[in-house]
Amino acid sequence: TNTSGFKRLVIEKPFGSDLKSAESLNNQIRRSFKEEEIYRIDHYLGKDMVQNIEVLRFANAMFEPLWNNKYISNIQVTSSEVLGVEDRGGYYESSGALKDMVQNHMLQMVALLAMEAPISLNSEDIRAEKVKVLKSLRQLRPQDVRKNFVRGQYDRGVIEGQEVKSYREEDRVAEDSITPTFVSGKLTIDNFRWAGVPFYIRTGKRMKSKTIQVVVEFKEVPMNLYYQTDKLLDSNLLVINIQPNEGVSLHLNAKKNIQGIDTEPVQLLSLIHISEPTR
């Protein structure tokens, strides 16, 4: 009999309910498994366009020199979905949007967008750069949360022609629940590359459409030469569409196809490929 098998442990959230319980769970696991046998995963990192973030950054000479606070005004990360909590009301009551989406999926995308170039594509080297970003996140005081974050909960409504229940009417959800199903807020990274650049995150259920998207908004040009046309120049945008239609678009200003000199925003679009939406 062949006894030279191997063992692997694959874990995804929820990994504990807070730092203390997560550390306790991690210690228990490491008593039974070697570190190289443990795979703590985030399924968002399996999405093609999430993986494409590092390729766009580090395989294209045009982006990396601009990828800093000298040229970028802000970065927006959105993950919205049409679905409600479905049959996960009991789980969602203990997590809410913050634990369900922000502390894992959203922060993983922020880390990929903000990290320094790793010394190699080895998973440990990439992880090391992500950790530096997470350590640079400014800690939020209660007054910061009140000023820079918004939480909400979906109510009854009509989506795609169908009436839908409110969150409090879902199975295994308390009638007076205050669990947020929507979170939007501003994160700040205190390092030389990103000082002063806000990272806006937003995620929610029962939204108008399913969208996972990154928008990089660049700063204005030093001077608007077209001020005599009463035209405010639109910001240059790099838009990374992760789902449902995977692709990259670059929004620039160009001359209108009319006599005289006036500008209009144009969009350079590249569809990487189109796939069916997945959870």
Model-predicted segments: where are they?
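Secretory/organelle targeting and membrane-embedding segments
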Residues: T1-I11, F15-L271, S275, R279
